[in-house]
């Protein structure tokens, strides 16, 4: 009930007004069956735009803190993430990564759409950074196709460090889905992930940085 209400009534019209999204390649998203949407990450609002434009229900993994926060803000977060169907993941323990992959696998086993930003966090400067291997580990284990998605303009609508949304021009491009056969060696998963991230960089016209975004700026200097 709440998911379509947010999408078509409460948030959708505002997102369209602010970002005037231009969508390309949406037919590349399978109409049925499990699918992984792998997108670059520029702004917090990226997930809302993906949910807005994809005709199927999209599920993200959300950190458990969003469901256990205190005070008014905590209650609002808990309500929003619960009614929108997001899945809580405990990221504090040693098995945090395994818990996330298990949750993603369950979404796909139910024939759902799992959306993920392989970079793991927002790009600090608009470039595309090295991806975590979990996305393709799940793809290889489940056989679900991966749709590469490039996003641009959301960092203007939702600038880093600002609580105010602004007008901008959002563009979202969906590439052709591809399947990844199981890998026998860990380095094969790493290589496939690097290839995916380089493709996202090339499609978006942005530079690829072979470091994790979380290490910026300690390990990576600006161009």
What are these regions (language model features)?
Residues 2, 98-223:
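Non-catalytic C-terminal accessory region of glycerolipid acyltransferases
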Residues 9-41:
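Helix-to-loop junction immediately C-terminal to a conserved catalytic motif
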Residues 21-23, 86, 172:
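Generic structural signal for residues in well-ordered beta-strands
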Residues 31-94:
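Catalytic core of membrane glycerolipid acyltransferases/transacylases, capturing the structured
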Residues 23, 73-74, 98-101:
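Structural motif corresponding to alpha-helix initiation and N-cap regions
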Residues 19, 94-98:
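A conditional alpha-helix N-cap/helix-loop micro-motif detector
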Residues 1-18, 70-85, 163-169:
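Alpha-helical membrane-targeting segments
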């Amino acid at each position: 009930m709440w998911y379509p209400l947010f999408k078509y009534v409460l948030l959708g019209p505002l997102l369209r007004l602010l970002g005037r999204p231009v969508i390309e390649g949406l037919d590349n998203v399978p109409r049925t069956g499990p699918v992984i949407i792998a997108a670059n990450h520029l702004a917090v609002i990226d997930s809302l735009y993906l949910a807005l434009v994809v005709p199927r229900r999209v599920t993200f993994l959300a950190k458990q803190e969003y469901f256990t926060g205190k005070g008014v803000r905590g209650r609002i977060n808990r309500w929003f993430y619960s009614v929108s169907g997001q899945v809580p993941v405990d990221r504090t323990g040693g098995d945090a990564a395994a818990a996330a992959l298990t949750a993603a696998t369950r979404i796909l086993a139910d024939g759902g759409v799992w959306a993920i930003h392989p970079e793991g966090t927002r790009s600090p400067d608009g470039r595309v950074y090295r991806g975590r291997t979990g996305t393709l580990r799940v793809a290889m284990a489940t056989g679900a196709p991966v749709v590469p998605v490039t996003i641009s303009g959301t960092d203007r609508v939702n600038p880093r460090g600002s609580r105010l949304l602004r007008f901008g021009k959002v563009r979202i491009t969906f590439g052709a889905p591809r399947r990844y056969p199981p890998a026998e060696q860990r380095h094969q998963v790493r290589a496939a992930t690097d290839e995916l991230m380089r493709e996202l960089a090339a499609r978006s016209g942005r530079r690829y940085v072979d470091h994790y975004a979380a290490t910026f700026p300690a390990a990576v200097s600006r161009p």
